[in-house]
């Protein structure tokens, strides 16, 4: 695992720093968790595409964003956006478009709680007004 300090929007510089510790000519897994809700849809698609272009065939891309379909979720997104950073409540189809032409791994784009069917949610985790949507895709 390699951690670099940089601006994710500067893909070329970030990838150069990563390449100092990771062989990007071999398959890797790129995690972009809780990141893309800070980007407008077109900017998110562009950002993901720039990173995916650097991945070797057989690599995996994992994306997740927070979102919600309730008044409470809308209030939360609004409150956050009124502060230091604008956040976007991406729809599921919009989020799915961030994967571009990549092949999604089953079960596809789903609520994170549905990623492992049959898994019992611990009793101490209450239902939420919002959700986390996730997806995993494999590069060709």
Which functions belong to the PLM regions below?
Residues 1-140:
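Alpha-helical subdomain
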